[in-house]
């Protein structure tokens, strides 16, 4: 790897020492951040091509602000004051015999695990703690990680009352869909059940945050796309039985977020409700416990379907969608074109309508939003319907992908996955 000084001498020798310090700081940051080096180097090259030092200085300041913002956002994605352990009961018994004490332990009967939350001292080292536990139990029979945070994504292009495309107008739907009683799980923010869209809906809720008034915009929107029974804005499956796990909390500093703990507890509850699919319209960083929980969900014969993310074409993979046990959904508009802010990558499985989608708005009325979150319900409903006649998720997915319309490069691609969803 080239040294910072070599990079500066080779590429930025015309810049005076003041600006060289700024460039050196940026490159130094990039060299210790996997996947960022080339991006920063390219951006610096563009900056240096500007005609005047004044413009260079302003561009450098903007780039520095952007990088600092990214660092701040990443820090907010983790609760560093405690760490998590998840394993089967016999592992916890073994750890207890070796002197490990866990204050908050939850039984996850649906998943078959115990989940412990442990206060983390200032000197906490995740890698050392994980290695110590593995040494005691003789292998990786436990998952150890931090409590990462996840977001539902900011709705893009929120429009006025009754704007946008009604979900039922975007795809050719089978005639039996309006009468099917599908058991569908949702992991999201809370649902405004007082909305007219849910006047006759079957919605069972369970809250996994302590907030007495959790946010409800996103959950209300997703639930209505699936199961609204308002004649003027019918959902895809108005007779579906929804089991809504409310996992989002809200603070002034962090905004709306869901923790790893709340997600795992929600998955556990939904398994006990005998749902066939779980709609997960949120995204965030990878987490070992969440990955294991989702693998167990799949072992139980339940299919998790998640949003690919709204970070843009150059963004890193988002989770849980990027896990192999999860169906990753991207969004398209009403002409089949890819949503401009959608993530891309090899993990993308299938595309569905997700641009300018009409949905119920918490507090009353309707609005329209765009994002991969709003595409997930289409795939969720299609999968739930197919699972009624074929209970094996792998076989059902083969059929679902085979029926998709290939709208990108031939075969599976990083923009549309297997193609645009079609109901069979």
Spell out what each predicted region is:
Residues 21-30:
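Bacterial N-terminal signal peptides
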Residues 40, 173-184, 190-203, 210-260, ...:
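Subtilisin-like serine protease catalytic core
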Residues 40-153, 277:
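Inhibitory N-terminal propeptides of secreted protease zymogens
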Residues 68-73, 267, 274-282, 288, ...:
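C-terminal subdomain of the subtilisin-like protease fold in secreted/lumenal serine endopeptidases
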Residues 110-115, 124-200, 415, 424:
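Protease zymogen maturation seam
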Residues 174-179, 256-277, 288-304, 314-328, ...:
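Mature extracellular/periplasmic domains of secretome proteins
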Residues 187, 192-198, 203-205, 331-373, ...:
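Catalytic-core environment of secreted peptidases
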Residues 226, 245-247, 354-424:
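Hydrolase catalytic cores
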């Amino acid at each position: 790897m080239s040294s910072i000084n070599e990079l500066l001498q080779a590429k930025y020798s015309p810049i005076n020492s003041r600006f060289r310090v700024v460039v050196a700081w940026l490159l130094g940051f990039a060299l210790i951040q996997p996947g960022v080096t080339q991006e920063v180097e390219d951006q610096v090259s563009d900056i240096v091509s500007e005609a005047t030092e004044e413009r260079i200085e302003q561009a450098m300041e903007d780039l520095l602000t952007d990088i600092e913002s990214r660092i701040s956002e990443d820090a907010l994605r983790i609760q560093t004051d405690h760490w998590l352990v998840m394993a089967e009961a016999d592992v916890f018994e073994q750890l207890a015999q070796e002197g490990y004490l866990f204050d908050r332990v939850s039984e996850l009967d649906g998943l078959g695990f115990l989940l412990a939350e442990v206060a983390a001292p200032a000197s906490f080292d995740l890698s050392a703690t994980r290695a110590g536990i593995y040494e005691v139990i003789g292998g990786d029979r436990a998952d150890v990680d931090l409590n990462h945070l996840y977001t539902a994504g900011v709705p893009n292009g929120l429009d006025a009352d009754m704007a946008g495309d009604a979900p039922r107008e975007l795809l050719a739907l089978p005639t039996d869909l309006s009468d099917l009683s599908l058991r569908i799980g949702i992991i999201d923010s809370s649902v405004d059940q007082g909305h007219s869209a849910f006047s006759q809906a079957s919605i069972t809720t369970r809250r996994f945050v302590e907030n007495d008034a959790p946010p409800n915009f996103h959950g209300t929107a997703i639930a209505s796309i699936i199961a609204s029974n308002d004649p003027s804005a019918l959902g895809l499956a108005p007779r579906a039985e929804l089991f809504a796990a409310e996992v989002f909390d809200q603070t002034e500093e962090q905004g709306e977020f869901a923790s790893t703990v709340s997600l795992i507890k929600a998955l556990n509850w939904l398994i006990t409700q005998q749902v066939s699919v779980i709609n997960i319209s949120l995204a965030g960083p990878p987490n070992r416990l969440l990955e294991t929980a989702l693998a167990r969900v799949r072992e139980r014969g339940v299919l998790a379907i998640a949003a690919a993310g709204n970070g843009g074409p150059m963004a890193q993979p988002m989770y849980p969608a990027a896990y192999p046990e999860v169906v990753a959904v991207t969004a398209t508009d009403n002409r089949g074109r890819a949503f401009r802010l959608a993530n891309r990558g090899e993990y993308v499985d299938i595309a569905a309508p997700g641009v300018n989608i009409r949905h119920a708005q918490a507090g009353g009325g309707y609005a329209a939003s765009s994002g991969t979150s709003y595409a997930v319900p289409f795939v969720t409903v299609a999968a739930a319907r197919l699972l009624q006649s074929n209970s094996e998720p792998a076989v059902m997915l083969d059929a679902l992908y085979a029926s998709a319309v290939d709208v990108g490069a031939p075969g599976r691609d990083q923009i549309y996955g297997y193609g645009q969803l079609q109901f069979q």
